[in-house]
């Protein structure tokens, strides 16, 4: 599937340092040991609603990873999926009286426009679940053959399930206890009470055909994929084993990332699906959790329609650390707009303070678990000195503007 147009990433002098990120499985910040080509799989949207700031914050975090890898001299193979066959999509389409495919296509296009406006680098492979049915079927067949999966004893709906105990390491990614797993499994799309399952935590791999639902033929009967297996199949088919980063929002730690990793591991025999499991925090609005039920979603497209500069949206989200749950507010946006104006004024000056030190510090801060708050403060200090008339380096304003563009994805004027 087509993604969106890529913004140009300008080159900076020298190379950035090795990236260090917090790994949810190991619960510590450690180096990301990528090869010449760094690989990353980030879970994409379920296209039944517009992109809100929680989505945007997640994709901005991994956009920074992408940019820092490029700055460190890596090629990047980035894969993102689209969960375009799932219950929330069908439910919203039925509510609105629209075909689920048309709803998905509309929201995917809006997502593309939002990502392009925010200057997010597109994935190398942008894959809809409906375009990966063959890969899913192949993976489920392998799990059935190995005993990692089974068909429930239900003549009407013979669904295929994954055995949660199929790998001895199951649970390592989330580090959650059994009770927490069960709670989150029920809250986040699981079906612990499904009759015929061997264990409450066993996860759906293939949902047998139901009336009114799309389905595809398979050796184990017509149906459609479960959620977690889609990502395992797409990642394995596009990247293979030895994935550097599996990423997404913190709400995907369990069950989604735990199971997608386990599905892949049960087939490949690898101990770890990914070397790093990286998760972004949640975004709330004005002191409350952002949710559809509250009706307080802040949509990127709505902000753009109101005339908000996408670079200000980007700076507002980057003002907080990516792993922290944090709140968006009018004050956050106002502060970001003020910061953007100051940066643009400073980098438009004919001269400024030498940029060597600020470039080195910004690179160092970002490479240390994407510490954007420190990076932004370092840039603020340079801009303040420049606006106060300090420095006589004629190349510095352009160097700083180029660094902000290349590393943070924020476009500033460069003469």
UniProtKB/Swiss-Prot annotation:
Disulfide bonds: none
Cofactor dependency: Zn(2+)
UniProt enzyme class: ligase
Record keyword Metal-binding present: yes
Keyword line: ATP-binding, Ligase, Metal-binding, Nucleotide-binding, Zinc
Entry GO CC: cytosol
Annotated motif 'KMSKS' region, positions: 289-293
Motif 'ERGGDP' region, residue range(s) on this chain: 187-192
Membrane spanning stretches: none
Subunit-structure text: Monomer.
Family from the record: Belongs to the class-I aminoacyl-tRNA synthetase family. MshC subfamily.
Entry protein name: L-cysteine:1D-myo-inositol 2-amino-2-deoxy-alpha-D-glucopyranoside ligase
Organism: Mycobacterium sp. (strain KMS)
